Amino acid sequence: MLKVYNTLTRKEEEFKPLNEKEVKMYVCGPTVYDHTHLGHGRTYVSFDIIRRYLEHIGYTVNLVINFTDIDDKIIKRANENGKNPKELSEQFITVFLNDMTTLKVKPADIYPKVTEHIPEIIAFIEKLIEKGFAYETENGVYFEVKKFENYGKLSNINLEDLFSGVRIETSEEKKNPEDFALWKTAKPGEPKWKSPFVEGRPGWHIECSAMSSKYLGEQFDIHGGGRDLSFPHHENEIAQSVAYSGKDWVNYWLHTGFVMVNGEKMSKSLGNFVTIEGISKEYDPEILRFFFIQRHYRSPIDYTAESITHVKNNLEKIYNVIENIRISLEKSEKSRVWGENEVLLYDILKNSKRNFYEAMNSDFNTVEALKSVFEVSNGVNKYLSLVKTPSEGLLLKAFDFFKIVGEIFGLFENYFKTSSESDDEEFIKFLIELRSDLRLQKNYEMSDKIRDGLKNLGYQIEDNPKEGTVFKKINI
């Protein structure tokens, strides 16, 4: 039974989607004015793993991630760079999507943009005005927070405490300081759209309510984002959406923890951020994914060069185990009679697989799940060191375990091949045989070219006096 931690209720709850086999999920996307950094990467990799696990246990996931492609920050950056806001936002949408591909994050089903949903946003605002939750002024439309009875439920504090010491937008035309903008009048030179109110553009919070309701309906299962979005963004989304429909909006609220640098949150405003584009030139994306799952998705994680190096070394140990299984399968026996060593490894595999699922069913606890991965790794290593002719069935069970882990965590991609990749492997074997013939003919120049070419493709050749020439997949 899957349980998830719900920020709204502050406890783990049994996961029951509205539709038995379908999960509707909305994750707040980026405001596209700059490069994606490691903090963003942590959020989207975390929800990618959550999505992968839900799909693994039988759900169909309908995932929506929005793009905020018009915003004060976008306008400011566009003016600084001498670009129009549309040009700038499209540039960084491309950067974001490329970064997600690099991180092996599966694409969302829909990536709606604010600028392409202005009619839906206007209609949403009109209904809020009609129902008495919003009011017009000369310069826009505001949501009247005091009209919404349960405001602050997500943040777990009352309205007075909520705004004590918090910097909020003030305006003489607002009824109350805490009221927030649904529609803003455009300043000279800014992008603007015609509306029944004033010519202008949407406020930040209304976009997610309008776009999620269009693609997922007035009620859906999971709303996610970084912890910093819980207030005011998600609090305001709840107010708008429940006021609009009169229904409970989202069943489960999930929030990811920060990536920390020297005790501070990684952020653009502090200038302590590391871009995905930059770090992926130095480290394989699987190392970054493996780094993120070292901590529970709700917990903060500290980024240091040392922590990445430590993660890299541990991941390479697992790669070596998977490669050793692949090589050992060639000398394994189907009918091997089981002895003490086989029974021991079988028990490790059975218990570790059970523990892995128990961990993932407990709010996607990757930290505990990883313990099972290392237990299997150690068990396989010990088994292969003790037997000369291993059991094929046991090795296939171990191989299958790593395949499942890889599918859920987005790891070990190079070790689990499609049929086309298997054809590639046959071609590589042919090249190795050709290289051996060239070496016998003492044509070392051509044989070295084959060796170096295969290395560039991610395959390392090892000449072993006992086993002949073998190859293994490496990360390049």
Curated annotation (Swiss-Prot):
Its cofactor is Zn(2+). InterPro entries: Cys-tRNA-ligase (IPR015803), Cys-tRNA-synt_Ia_DALR (IPR015273), Cys-tRNA/MSH_ligase (IPR024909), Rossmann-like_a/b/a_fold (IPR014729), tRNA-synt_1_cat_dom (IPR032678), tRNAsynth_Ia_anticodon-bd (IPR009080). NCBIfam families: cysS. This is Cysteine--tRNA ligase. A motif ('KMSKS' region) lies at residues 265-269. GO terms for molecular function: ATP binding; cysteine-tRNA ligase activity; zinc ion binding. One of its GO terms (cellular component) is cytoplasm. Binds 1 zinc ion per subunit. Its main location: cytoplasm. Its EC number is 6.1.1.16. SMART domains: DALR_2. It is an enzyme of class 6 (ligase). The gene is cysS. The keyword Cell wall biogenesis/degradation does not apply. Zn(2+) binds at residues 28, 208, 233, 237.
